Amino acid sequence: EEDRSGIPFSGEDGKLLTLMLSYIGLNRNNCYFSNLVFWRPPGNRVPNKEEIKICLPFTREHIKIIQPKLLVLVGGIAANSILNFSESVTKLRGREFSYQIKEKKIKVHIIYHPSFLINSPIEKKRTWFDLTEISKIIENEKY
């Protein structure tokens, strides 16, 4: 679906992500989405290190141009690549990190990827908790 539309998170993953956003009062019109890798790897596999290495500078430039007040990284590959970590989402979610752009620090939160949640519905409860925390940040900061 994403290949046809050119829009990140447009298939089943996208439907769940849209629902998740609506839970905290957001929608696709007041958020910016970008994939870490700008093409679908063959066989819908996880992007390899070389593909990430090629695309990461462009993704970082997107973040620099957009200048978000809050960055929500979706899934472990995005989180580990952007923040230069090597941890599971399970260890990273529920915590606040920062991403530096020049002199500005951007708050970062990490959530499970919707495809993971579709296959592991038990983790949805943790994700709703994470979204509630993100919602509080948005409300407190008046984004």
Give a label for each model feature:
Residues E1-Y143:
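A polyanion-binding, active-site-adjacent surface
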